[in-house]
Amino acid sequence: RNGDNYSFLTDEEQDIAIDIRNTSVDSATIVQSIGQTIFSELYPSKKYKYNKYDFAYDQYIDETLVGAAQGGVRLRFVTVASDYYNVSDQKLIMDSQANNEAIILLSSEVQYFEELETAAKIRKYIKQKNVSQLPESIQDIIRKRQAQARTLEESAKAQIDKARNKIRRCQKQAG
């Protein structure tokens, strides 16, 4: 299955699909890819403009700093892979104020993480193979999988954009 498309696989395709599925990838690799998408494509500016002033900000994905620290305010995107994702609104508000940061929880309603994980597994599987030495039929399957990885990465980019637009709004508790 690829999205809404179903197709029957040959034995070779099934073997490769199983090998890819069983390939392990570090969640840090996926988080790094999310950071690349967010801070290079969706938020390419390294500064926040307020009136005529520019303010540099530190870029975080989960607990990982992306790029160099500027020492100012922080912009932190939290993915479903982070333990921080399920903390209470009250904790998010307190941490935001204490650390001088804006915290954005990417929605779990979209499948950006899974798509990037599958793409990373495909890329890692291909890197481990000496493709030019494989039979032509296997090379064709691998080329199709490379195309699938590109499609998944493009889809994930759109899903990340969607996820940042479905953020959870934190409310201060009256008290």
Explain the meaning of each model-derived region.
Residues 1-175:
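Extended alpha-helical scaffold and adjacent linker segments that couple domains
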